[in-house]
Amino acid sequence: FEMGDIEFNGKMYYGLMLNLNCYRGEVHVRVGTTKDCIVLKNSLVGDFNIGKRRYVSLNGEREIKGLDAGYYQVLYDGKDMILKQIRVELYDRAEFPSGNITKVFVPKVKYWLVKEGQVRQIRKERDLQRVYKPFKRDIKSYMSHHSEKDMDSNLVYLMSMVEGAH
């Protein structure tokens, strides 16, 4: 749980302890200083912040065509928007020779570009070259000097470059 703010049922609440359960797609609010928590109804949750991370709720009327309903982290919000979708899947893993089966949570991350109402999946930073053709050389130059392991900050930098902030 981290400190955050949330819009719930059209009203803002500040300074709450929040947690996003990516496996179940739920937002949890801790009750005071106890270990108890409340699971919020998805259809009533609006945008929220957990720590310094901002999230949008794309449930019900707020859905964007081409994206699954759920919560998305906003990495970049300018003329165009980059959203990060985090899902967690549960797998059984058998250990040999003991024969024990353990449950393993595996995070699955997808990045989405929302440009002029159209949604496109971004698998690598280089996918932006196809969308922003005038900046193809700049994107290629940037990526030749930066690791593709830090996708979040690379996408933020590239989008701010494309939209004229750098």
Regions found by a protein language model. Name each.
Residues 130-166:
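Long, compositionally biased interface segments
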Residues 2-122, 126:
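Aromatic-patch recognition
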